Each structure stands twice: as structure tokens, then as C-alpha cells.
A protein has these predicted regions:
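Structural signature of the two symmetry-related core transmembrane helices
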Residues: 72-87, 167
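Intracellular juxtamembrane helix-capping segments at the cytosolic ends
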Residues: 109-125
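Short hydrophobic/aromatic, small-residue-rich stretches within specific transmembrane helices
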Residues: 15, 44-51
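Helix-to-loop junctions at the C-terminal end of transmembrane segments
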Residues: 56-70, 153
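Helix-loop junctions at membrane interfaces in 12-TM secondary transporters
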Residues: 89-100
Length: 206
């Protein structure tokens, strides 16, 4: 599958969209803390849910992306990130918040790996070097979504209005960017396939 250089903007825009979706909830965590009535210690425990969810799928991420393809993983799981953020404004309970953050972390982790795999495949197919540009676009997107959240907090816009208002816009943007993208072939790698599960070394464990 070939991709014209002019079409590389879609993968760059996908990184931007991913950052917009991933960052929406972060500026509203203080508001959700107040609405749920969490102490600082309780909030710290609840926030463990997101990295716990993200780490739980790392061992399986390669197999999942290989099985379904990065584009499909992105189209399925980035909306999950958006929807779990919005649902956190309705299910105002510590356990519900923890579970939603864990699911959010799973969606973020897999979609984040998937967009990077897709960018690598685009580079291999086109011979271009776009990874740095992609990560630059991601940084701009995360900064923008943080600024939007800060402005809306300053205007006393409720988290529910903010996150539910952003959800259809972000999903529509994702579909507009990602649906027309062709399925890129995997980058060819030399050598035999190794074990799909690597045992951590002492250096890895610290």
C-alpha cells in the first residue's frame, strides 16, 4: 500500500487528535474530586486506576495490535478514552471513578502504542521521516486541550458540560481523520520471531 506524502498529514493529525482526547479529563480532576468528596489521600488512591489500567495491557499490547491492526485499535479505543472521561462526571463514586480511570488507562495505552506503530509503518512505506513531527503535534494537542480545560474551569463551566460537549467533537474528528486512512503494511523485520513474552532482567527491575 502506498501513501502519497501529501497524505501523511492524516497520521500527524491523528497524533494531535489522540492528545486532545487523552488530556480532556486531567484539568477537571480537581472538580471531580470536590464533587465526589475525596480527600487528597483518597484521590491519590483513585488516581492509581489510570496507570494500573495502562500497565495491565502492556504484556498483551503487541498481540492485540498485531491481531486487529493499529487503525482498528485506534478507532475502537480512543472513543473509549473520551467516553470514560465523560462518564466520570455522572458516576460520582470513588469506586466508579477508579474503574473508569482504569478503563481510560487501558484505552490510552493501547491507542498510544497503536498510533506510534501506524506512524512507523507510514515512515517505512513512504521513506519519509514524520515521527518527530507526529510527537510535536501530540504535544501541541495536549497543550491545547489543557488550555481549553483551564479556560472552561475559569469560566465555571461544569465538568459534565465540558467533557460531554467535547466527546462528540473528538469522536467526529477521529472518524474524519482515521477512517479514510489506508491499512499500512507492517514494517519488514529481518530474523526469526522471538518469544512474545520477555522475562524482566535485574536491570529492568532496578
Amino acid at each position: 500500500v502506498s501513501l502519497a506524502p501529501s497524505g501523511q498529514w492524516r497520521i500527524i493529525a491523528l497524533f494531535f487528535t489522540h492528545a486532545l482526547a487523552a488530556g480532556t479529563i486531567h484539568t477537571r480532576i480537581p472538580d471531580l474530586q470536590l464533587q465526589i468528596g475525596l480527600s487528597e489521600a483518597q484521590l491519590g488512591l483513585v488516581l492509581i486506576g489510570q496507570p494500573l489500567g495502562a500497565l495491565s495491557v502492556f504484556l498483551f499490547s503487541s498481540a492485540i495490535i498485531e491481531r486487529f491492526g493499529p487503525r482498528r485499535v485506534i478507532l475502537w479505543l480512543l472513543p473509549l478514552v473520551v467516553c470514560t472521561a465523560a462518564l466520570a462526571t455522572l458516576l460520582l463514586h470513588p469506586i466508579a471513578f477508579f474503574v473508569l480511570l482504569a478503563i481510560n488507562g487501558i484505552g490510552f495505552s493501547l491507542s498510544n502504542i497503536a498510533v506510534n506503530v501506524e506512524a512507523d509503518r507510514v515512515e517505512a512505506a513512504t521513506g519519509g521521516r514524520i515521527m518527530n513531527t507526529c510527537h510535536g503535534a501530540w504535544s501541541i494537542g495536549f497543550l491545547l486541550t489543557s488550555l481549553v480545560g483551564a479556560v472552561l474551569r475559569g469560566l465555571d463551566v461544569a465538568p459534565a458540560i465540558h467533557l460531554w460537549g467535547m466527546a462528540p467533537l473528538l469522536i467526529a474528528l477521529l472518524l474524519w481523520v482515521a477512517l479514510p486512512m489506508p491499512a499500512m503494511p507492517p514494517r519488514p523485520h529481518a530474523g526469526e520471531k522471538g518469544s512474545k513474552l520477555a522475562i524482566p532482567t535485574l536491570a529492568t527491575l532496578g
